[in-house]
A protein has these predicted regions:
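Short, low-complexity N-terminal intrinsically disordered segments enriched in polar/charged residues
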Residues: 2-48, 154-156
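Short beta-strand edge/turn micro-motifs at domain boundaries
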Residues: 5, 121-146
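A solvent-exposed, acidic/Ser-Thr-rich amphipathic alpha-helical stretch
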Residues: 21, 40-94, 101-103
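Short, structured motif recognition centered on aromatic/hydrophobic residues
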Residues: 23-27, 52, 75, 125-128, ...
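Beta-strand elements of well-folded, non-transmembrane domains
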Residues: 35, 104-106, 130
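A cross-kingdom feature marking solvent-exposed beta-strand/loop segments within repeated
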Residues: 56, 106-120
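A short, structured loop/turn motif at beta-sheet edges
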Residues: 89-97, 129-136
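A short, polar/charged loop-to-alpha-helix boundary motif
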Residues: 146-154
Length: 156
């Protein structure tokens, strides 16, 4: 590469490594809460104004109410018997990341596709920022082409 290199790891370069255990506890508690299908009290893991930023198909949600009304509740309505299986979780100071899959039954409308009753896998990656014991930011990538292919829709 010629010339100046772009700044790398701008968001995580000054992370406080002493926060790793706290970050891990928050993320593991939140994942357990999602696996238990908690909605009413899941806010204990999120800061008041947290941002949830997903790829196209998910969009960006500001705050818990918007996240729940425009992602968590519709997603749970579309997929029942859902369990999150992280293949790996990584923790570094105030940062955490995971990739894995959710296994679920397609039991409601999702992206315009009527319920099929099929058990599918939903592959994802998550990146979280945790400050003062709460998730402040969550970047999400869901493999929608893979999900839709399992539901009989070829987007390509």
């Amino acid at each position: 590469m010629n010339g100046a290199r772009p700044e790398q790891a701008e968001l995580s370069k000054d992370t406080d490594m002493s926060k790793t255990a706290e970050t891990r506890a928050v993320i593991e508690g939140m994942v357990d809460g999602l696996n238990d299908h908690r909605i009413a009290d899941i806010g204990e893991f999120f800061s008041h104004g947290f941002s949830w930023m997903g790829n196209t198909g998910c969009g960006t949600k500001k705050g818990l109410k918007e996240f729940q009304n425009n992602w968590q509740k519709p997603f749970q309505a579309a997929f029942s018997d859902k369990v999150c299986i992280d293949e790996a979780r990584l923790y570094m100071g105030e940062w955490a990341a995971a990739f894995g899959r959710q296994e679920a039954v397609h039991s409601g409308i999702f992206m315009g596709v009527e319920a099929t009753g099929k058990k599918i896998q939903i592959r994802y990656m998550d990146f979280w920022k945790v400050e003062n014991g709460k998730i402040t930011d969550n970047w999400v990538m869901v493999d929608f082409p893979h999900v839709l292919a399992q539901l009989g829709v070829d987007v390509f």
